[in-house]
Amino acid sequence: MKNVDDLIDDAAALADRGLSRGEIADELNVSRETASWLVERADTNASVAATDTDDSPRDVHVDWSTIGEAGARLSAIGIALADALRDHSHDVDLVVGIEKAGVPLATATANELGTDLATYTPRKHQWDEGDMADLGGSFSRNFASVEDRDCFVVDDTVTSGTTITETIQAVREAGGTPVACGVLADKQGLGDVDGTPIEALLQVIRVGSGDD
C-alpha cells in the first residue's frame, strides 16, 4: 500500500522524466496543487512527517492501475460507464476522452455504445507554474470531430472539476453538445458541471481532520 512518501518519490521520478506538474497531477490522480506540493517535497528531500502542516494539500490519491493494466477489466468499466450514461440519452454518437488516462476508459465506453471517439488534451498538461489562463487545450485531429455531434465526455477522475469543465466548454466552442459526463471516481461529489450531469461509478469523500 502506498503512503505519501511513496507519492513524493513517484512525483520526483516523473519530474525527472520531464513531465510538467500538470502531467504529474494527471498521472497520480491528484490536483495540480497537490502535484506541486509533492514535487517541492521531493526537491527538498523532506518526508511528509516533516512537512505535515496546515499548508499541506487536502486531497485523495486514487490508484486504479489494477483496472488499467488489464484489457478485460477496462472493458468491464466501459460497460458500466456506458450503462450509466444511457440513462441520459440513447442517441449520442460520440464519446470524448480526456487525455491521458481518460482515453482508455472512453475507448471502452465508445466500444460498448457503438459510437465514434474523440480525444481532448487539457491545458493542464502544459502547466508547470503560474497562471494557466495563457495556455490552451486541443482536440486531436487523429480522432473524430465533435462539430455538430451529441457527446458523452469520459475521464478517469474528477479532482477539482477544472479539467472536465474546460473540456465541456471546449466541446461547446467546437460546435458539439455535451449531453453527460462519465467518470470512474469523483472526489468532489459533483452532480453536474456547467449544466452537464456527471455519472460517477465511485464517489470518493475525504473524512478526517482538516475538513471545514
UniProtKB/Swiss-Prot annotation:
Pfam families noted in UniProt: Pribosyltran
Alphabetic keyword roster: DNA-binding, Transcription, Transcription regulation
GO biological process: pyrimidine nucleobase biosynthetic process; regulation of gene expression; UMP biosynthetic process
SUPFAM superfamilies for this protein: PRTase-like (SSF53271)
Gene3D superfamilies (UniProt xref): 3.40.50.2020
GO MF annotations, alphabetized: DNA binding; orotate phosphoribosyltransferase activity
Similarity comment: Belongs to the purine/pyrimidine phosphoribosyltransferase family. GfcR subfamily.
General function of this protein: DNA-binding transcriptional regulator that functions as a regulator of central sugar catabolic pathways.
Free-text note on domains in this protein's UniProt record: Contains an N-terminal DNA-binding winged helix-turn-helix domain and a C-terminal regulatory domain (or effector binding domain) resembling phosphoribosyltransferase (PRT) domain.
PANTHER family assigned: OROTATE PHOSPHORIBOSYLTRANSFERASE (PTHR19278), PYRE-LIKE PROTEIN (PTHR19278:SF41)
Protein name, entry field: Transcriptional regulator GfcR
Record organism: Halobacterium salinarum (strain ATCC 700922 / JCM 11081 / NRC-1)
Native organism taxonomy: Archaea, Methanobacteriati, Methanobacteriota, Stenosarchaea group, Halobacteria
